[in-house]
Amino acid sequence: MYKAYFNLTRNPFELTPDPSFLFPTNRHNEALAALYYGVRRHKGFVVVTGEIGTGKTLLLRCLLRLLKQSPDVAYAYVFNGLLSPTEFLQYILADFGLAASGKNKGELLLELSNFLISRGSKKQTTVLVVDEAHHLSADILEEVRLLTNLETTEDKLLQVVLVGQPELDEKLDSVGLRQLKQRIALRARLDPLDGAETKGYIERRLQIAGSSQADALFSEQAIAAVHRHSRGFPRLINTICENALIAAYGRRLQRVTPGIIEDVAKEFRLDVIHEVETTGSHNGIVIPRATKGAPDVSSVLRRPVTRKQIWVRMRPFQ
């Protein structure tokens, strides 16, 4: 609707995760490097957590794009954690292209085991990627741990990537999952963007969408207002900016003003969300906290050869 008016070739603030729009902050680069390194080096478990709207699913899409470039990699992508253990196994097998219908749990495990052993004997990489992993029950998480028991003296046959909200960290801290937690090789955390990153994020998306003067569409004051109301969460930034462009188009303005941002924030009741946060309620978006546990991502990236290999593969996203 507003694309022609603002001389754009595509929607710059679509909510659908699109890897071509990835804004490579240091945190996102490190998280993507940790994911790719963990999978390609057969580290076993890799965990990434972050609040709602910090770009976790987009990060996974970028990882899957990288993995598709490698003919020796096969992955199953699970995005529904609200499954029974048997349904979870059926989903995994089906995504790997294996027969799953009508089989009981024992038969499913045998089929998957044979698949992993066969691929392992050929030095191939097999990956289980779980989005929204905070929804997984303790039973399923334990099932996943048991799947990783399949290993040779030299290698792990199944690589597992768990991505979810901070509740996943809390689950992994439970006594019943202590064995799984001990197997986590790499962890990364996605935090909201700071003010400078929010500005860069908005301008990059506008440039990718065809704007020749990205800084002309949103004033500095408007971008500051976007950051204040979104608190740096990319999903909220997209929502605010999308509706701000629609409002500017409707008013026949050539630039988004701070007043428009304030109107959008009121319409979406973002001030109410902020009030819930400041009162400490757990129903709103809480301020991210540091993750403790497995080795820090930065320590992994200090290895020269490995780091070079990873960043070469990641260039399309920078």
Regions found by a protein language model. Name each.
Residues 2-3, 9-13, 256-318:
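Trafficking entry modules
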Residues 28-39:
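Pre-Walker A adenine-sensing motif
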Residues 42-62:
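Walker A/P-loop nucleotide-binding motif
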Residues 98, 118-121, 161, 169-234, ...:
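Helix-loop-helix "sensor" segment of P-loop NTPases
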